[in-house]
């Protein structure tokens, strides 16, 4: 454990844990296949027991510690995949040595590597001084740089940033983005500060991170999160580039989610919400899953509810609305609105921008009940963690829960949803659109050229030459007396004839990433007979990928 005895406190890995064999719970895991209980194990086969890869509490409480909650989900996935990891080790070790090696690496993966806790003073506009608290957690450096957002909230704590950093590690692994996980938080309510004060806080926080080596294009790359956006990321990039990164040509790659003029990328603002849409799309169009839920594939006749009308909630609502689904309820911290005939996202966005709240929207009524218990097809919790608990899970009426937020479902609620045959599309897959497009922006900053710029004209000329070649061939074969046979491109081809723009590339790359990851989760769920337990399937995929990196790289310098 390392400790800075000043304004900053740096905590390294948790205390040493035995790396030998892990204990096992007596309860076996319940398998599901197409919504039905799994068949009894064959003679001689023992169902995988729940194993714990640290001293963290299992998912026994309705309101668990957030970081331990994530660790409990990790345990579920690790207990499923451990035997396969042992089987896949191609070494001369004995079976016992292989198993000890696997369990040791799983114990290495699980803790949060570093947590930086710091405080610093700022002078407010009225002349008074205030001490600001902030944190940055780095869960894993199996891939570098680390990646994770910065949030401004009075609820920020060490536990929260550790949990969110660990989720980022698994999230990046699920969608094959080569980053380790990190997360930062500043313990303030941004509504209580002027723009000038927020700029001071953001720039000073950046300098504190830089002094401790917690920010840099190849070290740790923050991004927007709750109550932060392009403006704050621009301040961070400018602060780093003007100081520590003054001589670094890649300095602006120290943060993503920037404005376009500061090295940002088209499509980043809507990326998380668009990713939520694509994630739902991949499962709602899968007939086998819809038959389990008693639903028809597609968005056409579906209703949905959004909890949280921020960046993620707004853009998720936009895309689902565009593809035919109907939003009947939207909720925020100050209240909810309801209209069984549907709520238009653009009209609601305009109203909120003008009035600062969704309450009073003329085309919807105030909803007094719990938004999480509204009768709908799809529920999108896009607010904060631990919203769906043991107490309200039995009353949830949605058939699909799409986790736009991080950690909205507690382990006990997750069990209830499995028992009730409700599909939960997990956070570590569904809201990975943001980090996916952040990866594209980071690469763009390192390449110092926007996507498509080098190929626009070549692709356009090539397409026109292709059309001319087809036209000339047809005229030689079928033309009479030198008559012409004009080739007219369709509207869709005309839109693409000049090649892909940066926005096109970002959108297609995100859609492909979400589709590929969804297929991997489906295959894993089928392979391990998990049925609707998509969360465990996603964790299994993440653990396999992170384990492979540690095992092949070696753990001497971990």
UniProtKB/Swiss-Prot annotation:
<dbReference type="GO" id="GO:0005783">
    <property type="term" value="C:endoplasmic reticulum"/>
</dbReference>
<feature type="modified residue" description="N6-acetyllysine; alternate">
    <location>
        <position position="390"/>
    </location>
</feature>
<keyword id="KW-0496">Mitochondrion</keyword>
<feature type="binding site">
    <location>
        <begin position="141"/>
        <end position="143"/>
    </location>
    <ligand>
        <name>NAD(+)</name>
    </ligand>
</feature>
<feature type="modified residue" description="N6-acetyllysine">
    <location>
        <position position="399"/>
    </location>
</feature>
<feature type="modified residue" description="N6-acetyllysine; alternate">
    <location>
        <position position="477"/>
    </location>
</feature>
<feature type="modified residue" description="N6-acetyllysine; alternate">
    <location>
        <position position="457"/>
    </location>
</feature>
<feature type="modified residue" description="N6-acetyllysine; alternate">
    <location>
        <position position="365"/>
    </location>
</feature>
<feature type="modified residue" description="N6-succinyllysine; alternate">
    <location>
        <position position="480"/>
    </location>
</feature>
<feature type="modified residue" description="N6-succinyllysine; alternate">
    <location>
        <position position="346"/>
    </location>
</feature>
<dbReference type="GO" id="GO:0006538">
    <property type="term" value="P:glutamate catabolic process"/>
</dbReference>
<feature type="modified residue" description="N6-succinyllysine">
    <location>
        <position position="200"/>
    </location>
</feature>
<feature type="binding site">
    <location>
        <position position="270"/>
    </location>
    <ligand>
        <name>GTP</name>
    </ligand>
</feature>
<keyword id="KW-0809">Transit peptide</keyword>
<comment type="function">
    <text>Mitochondrial glutamate dehydrogenase that converts L-glutamate into alpha-ketoglutarate. Plays a key role in glutamine anaplerosis by producing alpha-ketoglutarate, an important intermediate in the tricarboxylic acid cycle. Plays a role in insulin homeostasis. May be involved in learning and memory reactions by increasing the turnover of the excitatory neurotransmitter glutamate.</text>
</comment>
<dbReference type="GO" id="GO:0005739">
    <property type="term" value="C:mitochondrion"/>
</dbReference>
<keyword id="KW-0342">GTP-binding</keyword>
<feature type="modified residue" description="N6-succinyllysine">
    <location>
        <position position="68"/>
    </location>
</feature>
<feature type="modified residue" description="N6-acetyllysine; alternate">
    <location>
        <position position="84"/>
    </location>
</feature>
<feature type="modified residue" description="Phosphothreonine">
    <location>
        <position position="410"/>
    </location>
</feature>
<feature type="modified residue" description="N6-acetyllysine; alternate">
    <location>
        <position position="162"/>
    </location>
</feature>
<feature type="modified residue" description="N6-acetyllysine; alternate">
    <location>
        <position position="352"/>
    </location>
</feature>
<feature type="modified residue" description="N6-succinyllysine; alternate">
    <location>
        <position position="110"/>
    </location>
</feature>
<dbReference type="GO" id="GO:0005524">
    <property type="term" value="F:ATP binding"/>
</dbReference>
<dbReference type="GO" id="GO:0004353">
    <property type="term" value="F:glutamate dehydrogenase [NAD(P)+] activity"/>
</dbReference>
<feature type="modified residue" description="N6-succinyllysine; alternate">
    <location>
        <position position="390"/>
    </location>
</feature>
<feature type="modified residue" description="N6-acetyllysine; alternate">
    <location>
        <position position="503"/>
    </location>
</feature>
<dbReference type="GO" id="GO:0005743">
    <property type="term" value="C:mitochondrial inner membrane"/>
</dbReference>
<dbReference type="Pfam" id="PF02812">
    <property type="entry name" value="ELFV_dehydrog_N"/>
</dbReference>
<feature type="modified residue" description="N6-succinyllysine; alternate">
    <location>
        <position position="415"/>
    </location>
</feature>
<keyword id="KW-0007">Acetylation</keyword>
<dbReference type="InterPro" id="IPR006095">
    <property type="entry name" value="Glu/Leu/Phe/Val/Trp_DH"/>
</dbReference>
<feature type="modified residue" description="N6-acetyllysine; alternate">
    <location>
        <position position="415"/>
    </location>
</feature>
<feature type="modified residue" description="N6-acetyllysine; alternate">
    <location>
        <position position="183"/>
    </location>
</feature>
<feature type="modified residue" description="N6-acetyllysine">
    <location>
        <position position="326"/>
    </location>
</feature>
<feature type="modified residue" description="N6-succinyllysine; alternate">
    <location>
        <position position="162"/>
    </location>
</feature>
<protein>
    <recommendedName>
        <fullName>Glutamate dehydrogenase 1, mitochondrial</fullName>
        <ecNumber>1.4.1.3</ecNumber>
    </recommendedName>
</protein>
<dbReference type="InterPro" id="IPR006097">
    <property type="entry name" value="Glu/Leu/Phe/Val/Trp_DH_dimer"/>
</dbReference>
<feature type="binding site">
    <location>
        <position position="322"/>
    </location>
    <ligand>
        <name>GTP</name>
    </ligand>
</feature>
<keyword id="KW-0067">ATP-binding</keyword>
<feature type="modified residue" description="N6-(2-hydroxyisobutyryl)lysine">
    <location>
        <position position="147"/>
    </location>
</feature>
<feature type="modified residue" description="N6-succinyllysine; alternate">
    <location>
        <position position="527"/>
    </location>
</feature>
């Amino acid at each position: 454990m390392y400790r800075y005895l000043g304004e900053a406190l740096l905590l390294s890995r948790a205390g040493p844990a035995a790396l030998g064999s892990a204990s096992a719970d007596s309860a076996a895991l319940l398998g599901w296949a197409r919504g039905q209980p799994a068949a009894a194990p064959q003679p001689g086969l023992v169902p995988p027991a729940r194993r714990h890869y640290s001293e963290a509490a299992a998912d026994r409480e309705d309101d668990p510690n957030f970081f331990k909650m994530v660790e409990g989900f990790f345990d579920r996935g690790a207990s499923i995949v451990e035997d396969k990891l042992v089987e896949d080790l191609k070494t001369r070790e004995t079976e016992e040595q292989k198993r000890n090696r696997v369990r040791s690496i799983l114990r290495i993966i699980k803790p949060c590597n570093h947590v930086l806790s710091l405080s610093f003073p700022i002078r407010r506009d009225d002349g008074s001084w205030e001490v600001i608290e902030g944190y940055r957690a780095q869960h894993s450096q199996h891939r570098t740089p680390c990646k994770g957002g910065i949030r401004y909230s009075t609820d920020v704590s060490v536990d929260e940033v550790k949990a969110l950093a660990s989720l980022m590690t698994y999230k990046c692994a699920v969608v094959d983005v080569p980053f380790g996980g990190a997360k930062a938080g500043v313990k303030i309510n941004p509504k209580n500060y002027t723009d000038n004060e927020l700029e001071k806080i953001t720039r000073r926080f950046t300098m504190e991170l830089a002094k401790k080596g917690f920010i840099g294009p190849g070290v740790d790359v923050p991004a927007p999160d709750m109550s932060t956006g392009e403006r704050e990321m621009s301040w961070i990039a400018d602060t780093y580039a003007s100081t520590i990164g003054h001589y670094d040509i890649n300095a602006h790659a120290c943060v993503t989610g920037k404005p376009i003029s500061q090295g940002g990328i088209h499509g980043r603002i809507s990326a998380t919400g668009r990713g939520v849409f694509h994630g739902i799309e991949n499962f709602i169009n899968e007939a086998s899953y819809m038959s389990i839920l008693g639903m028809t594939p597609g968005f056409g006749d579906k209703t949905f509810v959004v909890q949280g009308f921020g960046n993620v909630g707004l853009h998720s609502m936009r895309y689902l609305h565009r593809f035919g689904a109907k939003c009947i309820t939207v909720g925020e911290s100050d209240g909810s609105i309801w209209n069984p005939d549907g709520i238009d996202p653009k009209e609601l966005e305009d109203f909120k921008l003008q009035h600062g709240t969704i309450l009073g929207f003329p085309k919807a009524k105030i909803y007094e009940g719990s938004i999480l218990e509204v009768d709908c097809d799809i529920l999108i919790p896009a607010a904060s963690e631990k919203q769906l608990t043991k107490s309200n899970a039995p009353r949830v009426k949605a058939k699909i829960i799409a986790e736009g937020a991080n950690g909205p479902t507690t382990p006990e609620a997750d069990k209830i949803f499995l028992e009730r045959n409700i599909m939960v599309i997990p956070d570590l897959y569904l809201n990975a659109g943001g980090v996916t497009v952040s990866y594209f922006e980071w690469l763009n900053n390192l390449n110092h050229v926007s996507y498509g710029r080098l190929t626009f004209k070549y692709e356009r000329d090539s397409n026109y030459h292709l059309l001319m070649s087809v036209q000339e061939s047809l005229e030689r074969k079928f033309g009479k007396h030198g008559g012409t046979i004009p080739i007219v491109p369709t509207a869709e081809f005309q839109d693409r004839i000049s090649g892909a723009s940066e926005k096109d590339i970002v959108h297609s790359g995100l859609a492909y990433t979400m589709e590929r990851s969804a297929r991997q989760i489906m295959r894993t769920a089928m392979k391990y007979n998990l049925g609707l337990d998509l969360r465990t399937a996603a964790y299994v995929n993440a653990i396999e990928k992170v384990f492979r990196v540690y095992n092949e790289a070696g753990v001497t310098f971990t």
